């Protein structure tokens, strides 16, 4: 088997040198046969020193003329033969010790950083001419030995779908002077074609850059720069390429198109031969103008048809009831303030200020007046939300001379013009008999107006509901649209799904005997088609869709047909959830388990759960103050626990007796003497005589057994009564305290929303149900807790300490800071002192209080039989050892740490308007208070039945919906009593306490003139928006367009971030 010789680096070097010699010979032959002779050129003195010492056989660095101080650009073309020979002759021969002189290398690529890289394998195309054309490169037209002032670096772009949004840039020298001269063999100098001025891209990028493409997706241009966009595949990967294209030459000859293109785009001018086909600003401005015209034309189609009735004419005859009073006009009127009207009104037989009688909305200026009169005679129609005022007035002609006027409200004298009205006292004595009743008050010019007023008298008309008005609820231009009822008149009969419409009702479509009302574009188109192709609704739909179509077109071109819809979705719509709620309500819920409230759906607090991470802190036994004793009618010979076993329990006595160091014992003989006081036989004076001790002593005296009978006041031994008591601090076997530390605490509130269970916490305070979303204002979690589980003789309870204990501070002696044992056998704290035993008589006033700390009270109780007695023992707290005892725990802990101070706030948003069942039973205990036909709502209160909302009606007039239970509402009543109330089914009679319209008659004088009656107006934001709806609509359209353009810019910047930091 023949052996193979491995290829070494020396063999590769020889092969590269041979290839380099062949290529250099070809380049030299092509340069000598050029059609245009190259004149000899003197070497620049600035570079002669640098070239003189350079090895001619080594690779030549080609440097651009950008920022390096060179006037000649060697990267444009190789030097002429004469200059090459001169360079070789001036180059010293290499030293013998070095390698043989190297032959010319293949062309190298200038990196722009003073270095060069070998030319990579370009792959297809195989011809340098095809490679240059594929790059969009055009060598210069002029002589390469001269300067090229227009030479610059241009940038082309490539990106691959397989690499995401990673962009690659390729920088090349480019000129706008047209095509260069060809060699005699019809070829360009390859050195002129491969002339990069930036870092060499990766090999796969260069291969994709030189890959011929079969079509052109688009041509883009701005000013003198023109690019062609192509899509192609290299090895199964789809690439996008944006190549810089040449422009028309200065001599009029157009550069040839790339041979692989299939689409020719005609040039339109010598200055801008390659023109972008779309994107002129005129098209965008024309689109905005078209949108403005469409919106203006479709004004009637954007809003539903509403009953916008004009002000009615004065009633014929006047719609007033009762009598009027016109005999008290001599009184001066009350001057109002803050622009309100003033006047003294007569209600019944009493005089009252106008501000106390007229409705509140009249005082606030929420009414409009229509002045149809001159200064001699006129008719005034004042319309409010609930009533109309009518008035016909006659004025006297003004006097010839001005008259000063001074009032109590303003002491300054107001100068009147030459044609001033009559003095204030003139005309006030006129009778109201010639006036129409139903005259309404006038509005002041300002509060300090001192001019004469006009005579006002009459009654208000019957209350009227405002006309029905609708509005369309637009949701960011997204369907569906809804119809919103602003005001509703019951007699119009508008219903939504069979339910009467009320102010605030949202419904896709309303139905009434008059027809249908809707805001839906689809319904509008259908109605437009049905109504002989009316243009109103069609234009409304066009205005709705036009901004989005325009945004899509602009984005599609701005992003070069990539990602316009994705950018709009990601930037504009992805982070926004359009509201789809039908109703929203807010209420409170108490924090006790079982509490319930009524939002659009019932919500009940099922329970409260506590979650935490638990760390066991051990267990300890608290000191227990324990006492025992006996009342005996004889003196036993053995006073130990065994000897007193017949009277004292053995187990506790032994437990106390064993703690002698902390035990307290006394023995009282003849506890009850003839005087009935307690005495201790063991206490003696120094002289040996006895005395009565009316109060008990501390346990400092040993038991009295063994003394003589003389110490017992002479009673026989068999009649002596003795008391034995024993007390001590001990460890009780059934009293323990276990400690647990809780961290990362969290309170879980268990709610029931219309039968659906859900849990809310501070981290997730929302509850999503089929009925809608419930947001709960959850109180903050308590934080770290310490739990004390106290087990006292079977009665176990837990106490909670807020926060971690400060064992290096004031809590150092607390039970939680002591060393505990797992089996609860360790007593916590130091050994306490002895307790105090007190022998207390049964009638001692001390027994009305509680034993003090560390005290035990013993009271003998004489039995009902001879030689029978008992003992009553009361033990107090734990004395000085309270720090170690459960009393400290009770003082520093709570039983419920997660109970918030206030109720929970509930905000409920329904998915759609909730249709709860309607109650049909009549309401009970309904009372009506107020007046009827007076323009002021009457108060209706009662108890609504269960089973759903009650749609309350009074004498057939709809009042509104009320929830089950007690309700209080206001209603305008147009009928006199009696009143029949119902919820849609059976009716019941309500008790009424109302006054008739005659009691609402009024007369008076109000300041102000005709011309200034409505000079002072107030406007709410809603009224301002209604008056400027056209500007708001146009602004919304412009905002949508701006949002779309910003979305496109964001998307394009995301894809073109390679221009800032390319690979």
Curated annotation (Swiss-Prot):
GO annotation, biological process: clathrin-dependent endocytosis of virus by host cell; fusion of virus membrane with host endosome membrane; virion attachment to host cell
Coiled coil (UniProt feature): none
Region (Functions as E2 signal peptide): 279-300
Extracellular compartment segments: 301-534, 583-1028, 1050-1063
Residues reported to bind Ca(2+): 670-671, 718-719
Positions marked as site (Cleavage): 300-301, 582-583
Location of region: Functions as E1 signal peptide: 563-582
Disulfide bridge map: 153-197, 590-595, 619-824, 641-653, 699-712, 758-767, 807-817, 931-934, 950-983
InterPro entries in UniProt: Rubella_Capsid, Rubella_Capsid_sf, Rubella_E1, Rubella_E1_1, Rubella_E1_2, Rubella_E1_3, Rubella_E2
Residue positions the entry lists as glycosylated: 353, 371, 410, 429, 658, 759, 791, 1011-1012
Transmembrane feature ranges: 535-555, 1029-1049
GO MF, one annotated term: RNA binding
Segments in the Cytoplasmic topological domain: 556-582
A UniProt-annotated Pfam family: Rubella_E2
Region (Disordered): 1-131, 305-347
Miscellaneous comment as given in the Swiss-Prot or TrEMBL entry: Structural polyprotein: Translated from a subgenomic RNA synthesized during togaviruses replication.
Name of the protein described by the UniProt record: Structural polyprotein
Species annotation: Rubella virus (strain RN-UK86) (RUBV)
Taxon lineage: Viruses, Riboviria, Orthornavirae, Kitrinoviricota, Alsuviricetes
């Amino acid at each position: 088997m023949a052996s193979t010789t491995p290829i070494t680096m020396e063999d590769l070097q020889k092969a590269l040198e041979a290839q380099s010699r062949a290529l250099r010979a070809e380049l030299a032959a092509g340069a000598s046969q050029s059609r245009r002779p190259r004149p000899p050129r003197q070497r620049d003195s600035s570079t002669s020193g640098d070239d003189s010492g350079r090895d001619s056989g080594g690779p030549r660095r080609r440097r651009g003329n950008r920022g390096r101080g060179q006037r000649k650009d060697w990267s444009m073309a190789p030097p002429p033969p004469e200059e090459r020979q001169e360079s070789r002759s001036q180059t010293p021969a290499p030293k013998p010790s070095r390698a043989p002189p190297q032959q010319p290398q293949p062309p190298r690529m200038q990196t722009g950083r003073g270095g060069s890289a070998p030319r990579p394998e370009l792959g297809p195309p195989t011809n340098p001419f095809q490679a240059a054309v594929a790059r969009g490169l055009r060598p210069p037209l002029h002589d390469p030995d001269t300067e090229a002032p227009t030479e610059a670096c241009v940038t082309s772009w490539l990106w691959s779908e397989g690499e995401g949004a990673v962009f690659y840039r390729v920088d090349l020298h480019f000129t706008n002077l047209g095509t260069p001269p060809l060699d005699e063999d019809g070829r360009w100098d390859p050195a002129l074609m491969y002339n990069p001025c930036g870092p060499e891209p990766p090999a796969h990028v260069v291969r994709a850059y030189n890959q011929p493409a079969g079509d052109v997706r688009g041509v883009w241009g701005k000013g003198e720069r023109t690019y062609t966009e192509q899509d192609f595949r290299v090895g199964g990967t789809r690439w996008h390429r944006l190549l810089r294209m040449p422009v028309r030459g200065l001599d009029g000859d157009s550069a040839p198109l790339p041979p692989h293109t299939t689409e020719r785009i005609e040039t339109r001018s010598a200055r801008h031969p390659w023109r972008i086909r779309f994107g002129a600003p005129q098209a965008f401005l024309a689109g905005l103008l078209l949108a403005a015209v469409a919106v203006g034309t479709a004004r009637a189609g954007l809003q539903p048809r509403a009953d916008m009735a004009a002000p009615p004419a004065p009633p014929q005859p006047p719609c007033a009831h009762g009598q009027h009073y016109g005999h008290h006009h001599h009184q001066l009127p009350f001057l109002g303030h803050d622009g309100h009207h003033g006047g003294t009104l007569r209600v019944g037989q009493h005089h009252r200020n106008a501000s106390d009688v007229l409705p509140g909305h009249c005082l606030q200026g929420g009414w409009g007046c229509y002045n149809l009169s001159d200064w001699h005679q006129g008719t005034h129609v004042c319309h409010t939300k609930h009533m109309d005022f009518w008035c016909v007035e006659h004025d006297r002609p003004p006097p010839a001379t001005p008259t000063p006027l001074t009032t109590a409200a303003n002491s300054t004298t107001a100068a009147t013009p030459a044609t001033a009205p009559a003095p204030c006292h003139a005309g006030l004595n006129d009778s109201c008999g010639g006036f129409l009743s139903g005259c309404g008050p006038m509005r002041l010019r300002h509060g300090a107006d001192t001019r004469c007023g006009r005579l006002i008298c009459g009654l208000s008309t019957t209350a009227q509901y405002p006309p029905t008005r609708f509005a369309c609820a637009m949701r960011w231009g997204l369907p569906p649209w809804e119809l919103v009822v602003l005001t509703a008149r019951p007699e119009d009969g508008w219903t939504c799904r069979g339910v009467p419409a009320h102010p605030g009702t949202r419904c896709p479509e309303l139905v009434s005997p008059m027809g249908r009302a809707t805001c839906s574009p689809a319904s509008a188109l259908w109605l437009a088609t049905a109504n002989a192709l009316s243009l109103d609704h069609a234009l409304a739909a066009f205005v709705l869709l036009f901004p989005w179509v325009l945004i899509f077109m602009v984005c599609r071109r701005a992003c070069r047909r990539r990602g316009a819809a994705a950018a709009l979705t990601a930037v504009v719509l992805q982070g926004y959830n359009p509201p789809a709620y039908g109703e929203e309500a807010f209420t409170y819920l108490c924090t006790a388990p079982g509490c319930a409230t009524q939002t659009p759906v019932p919500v009940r607090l099922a329970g409260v759960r506590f979650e935490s991470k638990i760390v066991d802190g051990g267990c300890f036994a608290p000191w227990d103050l324990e006492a025992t004793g006996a009342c005996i009618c004889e003196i036993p010979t053995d006073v130990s626990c065994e000897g007193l076993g017949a009277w004292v329990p053995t187990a506790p006595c032994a437990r106390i007796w064993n703690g002698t160091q902390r035990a307290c014992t006394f023995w009282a003989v003849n506890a009850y003497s003839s005087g009935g006081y307690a005495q201790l036989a063991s206490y003696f004076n120094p002289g040996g005589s006895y005395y009565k001790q009316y109060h008990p002593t501390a346990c400092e005296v040993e038991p009295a057994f063994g003394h003589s009978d003389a110490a017992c006041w002479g009673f026989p031994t068999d009649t002596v009564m003795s008391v034995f008591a024993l007390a001590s601090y001990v460890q009780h076997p059934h009293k323990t305290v276990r400690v647990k530390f809780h961290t990362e605490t969290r309170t879980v509130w268990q709610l029931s929303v219309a039968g659906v269970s859900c849990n809310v916490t501070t981290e997730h305070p929302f509850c999503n149900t089929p009925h809608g979303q419930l947001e709960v204002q959850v109180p903050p979690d308590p934080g770290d807790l310490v739990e004390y589980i106290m087990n006292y003789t079977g009665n176990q309870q837990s106490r909670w300490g807020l926060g971690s204990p400060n064992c290096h501070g004031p809590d150092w002696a607390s039970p939680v800071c002591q060393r505990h044992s797992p089996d609860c056998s360790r007593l916590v704290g130091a050994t306490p002192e002895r307790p105090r035993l007190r022998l207390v008589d049964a009638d001692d006033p001390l027994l009305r209080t509680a034993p003090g700390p560390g005290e035990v009270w013993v009271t003998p109780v004489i039995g009902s039989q001879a030689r029978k007695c008992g003992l009553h023992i009361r033990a107090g707290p734990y004395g000085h050892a309270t720090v170690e005892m459960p009393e400290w725990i009770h003082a520093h802990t709570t039983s419920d740490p997660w109970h918030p101070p206030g109720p929970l706030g509930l905000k409920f948003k329904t998915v759609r308007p909730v249709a709860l069942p309607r109650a049909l039973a009549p309401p009970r205990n309904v009372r009506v208070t107020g007046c009827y036909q007076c323009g002021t709502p009457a108060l209706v209160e009662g108890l609504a039945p269960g089973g759903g909302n009650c749609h309350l009606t009074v004498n057939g007039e709809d009042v509104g919906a009320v929830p089950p239970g007690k309700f209080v509402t206001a209603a305008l009543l147009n009928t006199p009593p009696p009143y029949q109330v119902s919820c849609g089914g059976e009716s019941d009679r309500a008790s009424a306490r109302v006054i008739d319209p005659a009691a609402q008659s009024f007369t008076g004088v109000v300041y102000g003139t005709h011309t200034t009656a409505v000079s002072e107006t107030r406007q709410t934001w809603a009224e301002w928006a209604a008056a400027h709806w056209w500007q708001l609509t146009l602004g919304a359209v412009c905002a949508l367009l701006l949002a779309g353009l910003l979305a496109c810019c964001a998307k394009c910047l995301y894809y073109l971030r390679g221009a800032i930091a390319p690979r």
